[in-house]
Amino acid sequence: MPVQTAVVVLAAGAGTRMRSKTPKVLHTLGGRTMLAHSLYAAAEVDPTHLVTVVGHDKERVGVAVSALEAELGRPIAIAVQDEQNGTGHAVECGLSALPADFRGTVLVTAADVPLLDGRTLHALVDEHHSEPTPSAVTVLTFTAPEPRGYGRIVRLPHDGEIAEIVEEADATEEQAAITEVNAGVYAFDAEFLRSALGQLNANNAQGELYLTDVVKIAREAGAPVFAAHLADSAKVAGANDRVQLSRLAAELNRRTVENWMRAGVTVVDPSTTWIDVGVTLARDVTIHPGVQLLGTTAVGEDAVIGPDTTLTDVTVGEGASVVRTHGSESTIGAGATVGPFSYLRPGTVLGASGKLGAFVETKNADIGAHTKVPHLTYVGDATIGEYSNIGASSVFVNYDGVAKSRTVVGSHVRTGSDTMFVAPVQVGDGAYTGAGTVLRFDVPPGALAVSGGKQRNIDGWVQRNRPGTAAAEAAAAAGLHHSSDLHETEKQDLKDGIEQ
């Protein structure tokens, strides 16, 4: 019968060195909080029970745990450590959330080691069960050339087995020189752990219940103690302040980018490319410098992203090109082109082979296949059919100061530059609009819509009103002459409007 496994994630600390109103475990890197990274790794073990121990700002951390419970699709019990009395006490609180008759392996990890992955936890469990006689405790260790801040692994001189873990504050000078250190990740036999926790005391420099003392208790009881040595120490590096967090974020990103490159993605400049862990990329995607792919962004085969592009929760179809664009919660169809300097706000859907060009902003807009919005246009709360073309400097006027309304433009529509769509309004299939048209009423299919009065030219206006200027001289050279026979109404026009 397979051995049951429970995972206890410690997330109760205050994290004062972050100097933040946000709990330490809710600071983010790679698109997830540190807590989320830890729970994702724990879930990969497929434990029978998953417990998070909360304490500082427990309500806020508890809400985050509940959200992750839905995201991971598995129950996560919450145990509360009201008084921060050391790691031993925290694990004791965690065990209280398990069934009283639970038998098996208890994995203990921390919520501030975001690079720890499920494979490492699997390896720890395998090591814990590797000998015929089950281990009471298996400790994950690593070698730290600069071991400051870590508990030291003290081994027996005659056989090299672990004798105890000594916290730095309690270490002798000789023990402080040891470079093998405790990673803070353990596998315990559940029955032994319950017994050992009851034997802990606070007779130490910190006045706390150390979980590490369980190792010494096991050794004194003659119970087996194993060690699993981790070569990749970055996986268990903690983030206690923002400097450490930024370093871990950079290391996580480096690993993420390199993994995608090995999977067939071209990243022209890895040093300026940031990819969240929730992003998915198909093979033969090309990413140019200065790109951020965030959240759950997904990019299809042969798409080209960048340079200087940020996409958050955006789906990009095969063969699309997205250049110098900022987009969020949008969909870009296969073969579409976007940019440069486009802004895709939430709810934008661009169909296959469509185009959003320079200085185009879209929001809550469904734009059909092969439709082009080439430049200098705002498209908000709109539906545009296939094979249409929206002229430059057009605006979908969707807000009347109280409510937003929708514009519907059909297929094969051609609109002149500077068309204003005053919503709610509909433009039928195959319709045209003249340049500068303000659409306040529906346009039937196949119609040409124009608006505005007849153009009037007032001859000689510059010479009369701007004499001696370069414009007047240029006009004179072009053969224009002062006109003295203006109609009285034209003079009034000048007085009332044009000169103003």
Curated annotation (Swiss-Prot):
| Molecular function terms from GO | glucosamine-1-phosphate N-acetyltransferase activity; magnesium ion binding; UDP-N-acetylglucosamine diphosphorylase activity
Q: Which residues cross the membrane?
A: none
Show the Pfam families listed in the entry: NTP_transf_3
Main localization category = cytoplasm
Q: Which UniProt keywords apply?
A: Acyltransferase, Cell shape, Cell wall biogenesis/degradation, Cytoplasm, Magnesium, Metal-binding, Multifunctional enzyme, Nucleotidyltransferase, Peptidoglycan synthesis, Repeat, Transferase
Stretches the record annotates as Pyrophosphorylase: 1-242
Q: Which reaction does it catalyse?
A: alpha-D-glucosamine 1-phosphate + acetyl-CoA = N-acetyl-alpha-D-glucosamine 1-phosphate + CoA + H(+); N-acetyl-alpha-D-glucosamine 1-phosphate + UTP + H(+) = UDP-N-acetyl-alpha-D-glucosamine + diphosphate
Q: Summarize subunit and interaction data from the UniProt record for this chain.
A: Homotrimer.
Family, per entry? In the N-terminal section; belongs to the N-acetylglucosamine-1-phosphate uridyltransferase family.
What is this protein's function per UniProt?
Catalyzes the last two sequential reactions in the de novo biosynthetic pathway for UDP-N-acetylglucosamine (UDP-GlcNAc). The C-terminal domain catalyzes the transfer of acetyl group from acetyl coenzyme A to glucosamine-1-phosphate (GlcN-1-P) to produce N-acetylglucosamine-1-phosphate (GlcNAc-1-P), which is converted into UDP-GlcNAc by the transfer of uridine 5-monophosphate (from uridine 5-triphosphate), a reaction catalyzed by the N-terminal domain.
Q: What is this protein called?
A: Bifunctional protein GlmU
* Annotated organism of origin: Rhodococcus jostii (strain RHA1)
